[in-house]
């Protein structure tokens, strides 16, 4: 038996906590025997004193074990259980292609996703732009879809990592969100509750990233890889670029449209293709579905070319109560904004920089995201035909096409786009889509 205040005192004085002490505290968070004040105190001591790798692993596994941990053994699946997690960005629609692509190659992807947070778009919000799409199937239905289709994308239920939900709510109001061991534990508690064989992390870098600097993004990626592997799940991470909108669109319905066009081959943004393929390659190799990069890429290209990935996406949509002919007739089902027109720069030049965070917030301001949890989303608004870094901008090439609910909203968004995109008289050096791969 432990005392919460003695655990807090031990960490306050700079000592490492044991696995038993951490589990006692996390179980107390779950069953409400630990007060909010005690949670806040421990969070602040961790913020200032950090955690050792064994402490980080214990924290993550204790939060994972505070609720249901999915077990797929009874289904006798003939492939690995694999998933991807992104730290979030703007125009980051990779999940919608990646899940079906990996499933078409023989993996099983039980993806538990989130809603938009701040300037970043949420996968669940995007999918809810599809009429009827059910993001909360019951547990049995979720398992059936994974078994039959190979991929399902759903929301987090209250039974998964409940201690994390309470811990995070306290961190959010006590200035302890940006602690790498606490971020790592929060991300991985939910992901490891999926019962995975392998995981790939997409950690964003740049003006639209969650972490403010390259060094902090790198530190987070290394922490997640270390903790997840320590918890027994094969994990790699990619540091990917978020100095510009990843896709050619940003919003909800507009990104779903681009995802379908990507899968069918109608249109593939080159940077989106690079990042999606790189993440899929990691999943295939970690899941033992391919022996190396070349074999993985060949398999992934094949399921794009032969239509199998698009077919899997269509089957997932139908299985989750969306239209059965969605892939073939997506424009019939996706909402369209009242006003769609291009915005042009006031001067000419090359795009040298982009405030990606500001562009994400512009989508939120138009109604495409939430300022608070109770807000309703306008799924139709957003940007398409986004210009990219290095593009030559003149009176012919717009910065973007803005899809808005009315003229006033369009004008506000146009102002935000112009302010967020910087022009120069010479083109900038090109930046990679993927900066680094982290394996340990």
Curated annotation (Swiss-Prot):
Catalytic activity: thymidine + phosphate = 2-deoxy-alpha-D-ribose 1-phosphate + thymine
Transmembrane domains' residue ranges: none
KW Glycosyltransferase (keyword) present: yes
Highest rank taxon of the organism: Bacteria
One Pfam family it belongs to: Glycos_transf_3
Gene3D superfamilies: Nucleoside phosphorylase/phosphoribosyltransferase catalytic domain, Pyrimidine nucleoside phosphorylase-like, C-terminal domain, Transferase, Pyrimidine Nucleoside Phosphorylase, Chain C
Signal sequence residues: none
GO molecular function: 1,4-alpha-oligoglucan phosphorylase activity; thymidine phosphorylase activity
Top EC category: transferase
This protein's UniProt keywords: Glycosyltransferase, Transferase
Any GO BP: pyrimidine nucleobase metabolic process
Cellular-component GO terms for this entry: cytosol
EC number(s) per entry: 2.4.2.4
Biological or metabolic pathway of the protein: Pyrimidine metabolism; dTMP biosynthesis via salvage pathway; dTMP from thymine: step 1/2
Family annotation (SMART domains): PYNP_C
HAMAP family listed in its UniProt record: Thymid_phosp (MF_01628)
Main function: The enzymes which catalyze the reversible phosphorolysis of pyrimidine nucleosides are involved in the degradation of these compounds and in their utilization as carbon and energy sources, or in the rescue of pyrimidine bases for nucleotide synthesis.
Assembly behavior: Homodimer.
Family: Belongs to the thymidine/pyrimidine-nucleoside phosphorylase family.
Name of the molecule in the record: Thymidine phosphorylase
Organism from which the protein derives: Salmonella paratyphi A (strain AKU_12601)
Gene that produces this protein: deoA
